[in-house]
């Protein structure tokens, strides 16, 4: 059931999706098409005929997830159902070798897809193809839907969320929050999955590995509970990372990542941000004062909420939980291998940042490489 949330009556669904004849995303997923298997076409038709009203946002729940449960009427009910279904712990609801649920989250300001650039529509189409084929849940969160989610699942965070001056910062914060509360896979709308998320973790990825400098061996037998890719992979001694604008020699992506619900590393990110915002609030008598807003506007989003903030949280958590030497994660000396640290899987740069050019390549292989999983069109944010 894909739901196009709207305050309008169900009949308006045809108006909302009157774009099907011109937009391949809806052509492929809302009517039979010779370009996709008949089995997928039949499922897609069923999806698009099942419509419920809601205030915001769009979602899809596999039929097998709702067979024994009341049909969700709102995005919040759908998220609660996703939590309920995956809490049962059936293996088919999770990525292999992990406790990460097969739930995809994406964000965008609105669902007027006729105004979206072609590349965004094509990216979402690819995500939806894998979602339907592998019986995954899918959520597209609009701006209003993000506020609704925060107010329902994390009401104590409303002031922090609303104080962030830029929408990109709110989106950064939301992706971590929704992964914390629901779990799943996050992908920016301008990311294209090159492989289905159900195939992202292989038995090769969770094998033991050795820190080549300290000779420490990491041989965790735990299921993966968080998964991140590398955005920057530089030798800490040659200052390449600084020349390219990266404060960390090993910096993680946050245009795509995956996590089990309620994972401590994500809590570390949230606590770091809350501490920084509370410090500003204490200094200026609240977060809504003009002085507080001025200070917040002067902060770099990449540092406050973006990949630098994610990297900092991961570095702190993995140092505490596993004593990790951060630069041991480099793939420059082993051809780019995945590394499991405790229950966090760090994928090489090619996985989420393949196809980089000669400058700033950092070991990135072509998008055709078997380890390439996601292609980010906004690469280098």
Say what each PLM segment does.
Residues 1-171, 187-381:
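Glycosyltransferase-associated regions of secretory-pathway enzymes
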Residues 173-184:
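Small-residue hinge/turn detector
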């Amino acid at each position: 059931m894909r739901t196009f949330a709207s305050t309008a009556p169900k009949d308006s669904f045809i108006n909302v999706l009157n774009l099907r004849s011109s937009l391949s995303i809806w052509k492929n997923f809302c009517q039979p098409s010779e370009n996709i298997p008949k089995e997928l076409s039949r499922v897609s038709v069923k999806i698009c005929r099942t419509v419920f009203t809601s205030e915001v946002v769009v979602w899809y729940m596999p039929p097998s997830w709702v067979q024994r449960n009341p049909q969700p009427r709102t995005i919040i009910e759908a998220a609660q159902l996703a939590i309920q279904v995956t809490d049962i712990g059936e293996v088919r609801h999770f990525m292999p070798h992990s406790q990460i649920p097969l739930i995809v989250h994406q964000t965008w300001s609105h669902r007027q897809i006729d105004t979206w650039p072609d590349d965004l529509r094509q990216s979402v189409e690819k995500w939806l193809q894998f979602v339907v084929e592998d019986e995954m849940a899918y959520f597209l969160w609009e701006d209003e839907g993000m506020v609704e989610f925060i107010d329902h699942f994390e009401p104590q965070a409303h002031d922090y969320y609303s104080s962030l001056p830029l929408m990109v910062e709110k989106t950064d914060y939301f992706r971590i929050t929704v992964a914390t509360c629901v779990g799943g896979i996050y992908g920016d709308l301008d990311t294209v999955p090159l492989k289905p998320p159900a195939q992202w973790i292989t038995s090769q990825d969770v094998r033991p590995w050795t820190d080549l400098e300290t000779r420490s061996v990491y041989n965790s037998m735990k299921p993966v509970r968080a998964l991140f890719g590398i955005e920057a992979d530089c030798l800490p001694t040659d200052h390449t990372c600084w020349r390219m604008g990266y404060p960390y020699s090993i910096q993680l992506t946050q245009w795509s990542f995956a996590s089990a619900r309620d994972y401590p590393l994500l809590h570390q990110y949230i606590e770091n941000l809350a501490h920084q915002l509370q410090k500003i609030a204490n200094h200026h008598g609240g977060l809504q004062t003009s002085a507080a807003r001025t200070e917040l506007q002067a902060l770099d989003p990449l540092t406050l909420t973006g990949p630098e903030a994610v990297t900092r949280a991961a570095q702190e958590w993995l140092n505490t939980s596993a004593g990790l030497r951060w630069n041991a994660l480099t793939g420059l000396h082993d051809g780019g291998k995945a590394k499991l640290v405790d229950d966090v899987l760090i994928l090489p740069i090619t996985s989420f940042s393949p196809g980089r050019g000669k400058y700033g390549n950092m070991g990135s292989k072509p998008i055709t490489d078997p380890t390439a999983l996601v292609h980010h069109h906004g690469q280098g944010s």
